[in-house]
């Protein structure tokens, strides 16, 4: 007994079967996958942060 898992495409909301029949999962198509990638590249999407500076923020490629 195998239960079919479905998810919604994050870009368009279309139902997508989670399995080998959907090579672009969780996206429904290559188009939706590229739209999402473009949103990340344009910084329309980002992972939230606390905004606190860490030690690495003070690093510079220039040596003092």
From Swiss-Prot:
Its cofactor is Zn(2+). One of its GO terms (molecular function) is DNA topoisomerase type II (double strand cut, ATP-hydrolyzing) inhibitor activity. Residues 45-64 are annotated as: Disordered. Keywords: Metal-binding, Zinc. Residues 54-64 have a biased composition (Acidic residues). Transmembrane segments: none annotated. GO terms for biological process: regulation of DNA-templated transcription. InterPro entries: DNA_gyrase_inhibitor_YacG (IPR005584), Znf_NHR/GATA (IPR013088). Gene3D superfamilies: Erythroid Transcription Factor GATA-1, subunit A (3.30.50.10). Binds 1 zinc ion. Zn(2+) binds at residues 9, 12, 28, 32. Pfam families: YacG (PF03884). Inhibits all the catalytic activities of DNA gyrase by preventing its interaction with DNA. Acts by binding directly to the C-terminal domain of GyrB, which probably disrupts DNA binding by the gyrase. Belongs to the DNA gyrase inhibitor YacG family. Interacts with GyrB. This is DNA gyrase inhibitor YacG. It comes from Citrobacter koseri (strain ATCC BAA-895 / CDC 4225-83 / SGSC4696). The gene is yacG.
């Amino acid at each position: 007994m195998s239960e079919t898992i479905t998810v919604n495409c994050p870009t368009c909301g279309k139902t997508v079967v989670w399995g080998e029949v959907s090579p672009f999962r969780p996206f429904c198509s290559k188009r939706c996958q590229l739209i999402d990638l473009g949103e990340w590249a344009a910084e329309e999407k980002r992972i939230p942060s606390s905004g606190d500076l860490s030690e690495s923020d003070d690093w510079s490629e220039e040596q003092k």
